[in-house]
Amino acid sequence: MCGKLTLPLKPALLTSPMTRLTLLSSLVLLTLLAGCSAPEGPATRLPKANVLPLAIDDAYQFRKILTSSFDPEYVETETKNDMITFERARRSFGAVDSTEMAQRYGNYYTIFWRNSTRSDVTLRLEYRQAGLGNFVMAKERFYPDTAGSHRSTFEVTGDEFSENGGVTAWRALLIVEGRIVALRQSYMWR
């Protein structure tokens, strides 16, 4: 016989029951915390977008704004781009009939922003839709006592999209104490 292929294991680190219990509880806690990042709820829709004073502050800034449209009237049904196919599949995931699918058509905005000073921040998306002309619609998200990098999402979908049309122009605002401290807008915003 050439020898044993397995070596006897001596669990040096896991000898005491207290060490095993600590390791097990750490794994359970880590698993629970990994599932705590819940998706954002719907943004608050404002009846009227109030005009606010402009006071730009370098401590607040937009990093990137991603826009996407999911409208079958203006998008070709077949594409060879895998990323576009995946994005459409992600947006329509879970829709079981044409009514649910129609509620997912619209414009989607993902906004990456950051602030270096801890404060109460309101992120507002103001937008104009094709069927409303120059009337400005607005949605907000409030972040109490926050600092650091953030990712926020806004959707203009469902009845709002089907009745008023797609978004023609938009602007994103960071608001602190009733003042606009950061601003980013689309080319068509005036």
Predicted regions and their residues:
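Post-signal-peptide N-terminal segment of Sec-exported extracytoplasmic proteins
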Residues: 57-93
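Short proline/glycine- and polar residue-rich coil/turn motifs
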Residues: 142-150
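Bacterial Sec signal peptide processing site at the extreme N-terminus
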Residues: 34-52
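Beta-strand-rich binding/interaction modules
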Residues: 120-128
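Sec-dependent bacterial lipoprotein signal peptides
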Residues: 1-36
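Short beta-strand elements
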Residues: 180-190
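Short glycine/proline/serine/threonine-rich loop/turn segments at secondary-structure transition edges
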Residues: 161-167
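Contiguous beta-strand segments within globular domains
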Residues: 78-115, 151-155
